[in-house]
Design a protein with these regions (language model features):
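Single conserved hydrophobic/aromatic residue that forms the stacking wall/gate
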Residues: 1-11
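Helix-enriched interaction subdomains in cytosolic or periplasmic regions
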Residues: 12-45
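A short, acidic, amphipathic alpha-helical segment used as a generic capping/interface helix at domain edges
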Residues: 121-139
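Long, compositionally biased charged/polar accessory segments in the mid-to-C-terminal portions
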Residues: 93-99, 117-126
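Short, flexible loop segments at boundaries between secondary-structure elements
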Residues: 35-59, 100-103, 160-179
Length: 179
């Protein structure tokens, strides 16, 4: 947030949409600003606003979905609860967890540029993760990383059970329930 100190504006916190940026700005760049700015992911901000009742999801959103934990939000930042808190606050949302979730979740394959790696034998990383999604038999995959969304959208045709899968950001799903 921004606060006024005397007649000057001071930036106190930073919010990122991208978990990769969260890592870079919050951990790498923090070395240069002595860690004086807190950097949080947008799902952490949304979860906090929901807890403070500054956001109130009221519209019914009848969807069954599964949630994919992005590597940089989960394993690198330790945040697994905020996206689920946001989704669970939405009336009508039913979350069907994949067997491998939270700290056991597999990468979507976008991290480290694996999306562009040509696999000659076996399956792409995204195919492995999409098979886990397919096992849940849901029509929607929620995530909170735009890189994951891009990779899942480009890979969903490779796995029969996920050809028609809808992929959507947690904040976008929440917005359907806010009046």
């Amino acid at each position: 947030g921004v606060r006024l100190v005397g007649s000057e504006m001071c930036i106190r916190d930073r919010v990122t949409h991208c978990p990769h940026c969260l890592h870079t700005i919050g951990k790498e760049y923090a070395k240069f600003d002595d860690g004086q700015f807190e950097t949080i992911h947008h799902t952490e901000l949304l979860a906090d606003l929901l807890k403070q009742e500054k956001l109130k999801p009221t519209k019914q959103v009848n969807e069954e979905l599964t949630y994919h934990d992005p590597c940089y939000l989960g394993r690198h930042h330790g945040e697994y609860d905020a996206p689920r808190t946001v989704l669970e606050s939405i009336p009508g949302i039913k979350i069907k967890e994949m067997e491998k979730n939270k700290d056991k979740a597999l990468c979507c394959g976008m991290g480290g540029g694996n999306m562009w790696y040509e696999v000659h034998e076996g399956k792409d990383i995204v195919e492995n993760r999409l098979e886990h999604v397919g096992e849940t038999k849901v029509e929607k995959l929620a995530t909170s990383c735009s890189f994951c969304m891009i990779n899942f959208n480009s890979g969903k045709g490779k796995v029969k059970k996920t050809e028609e899968l809808q992929i959507e950001d947690v904040a976008s799903i929440l917005s359907k329930s806010i009046e």
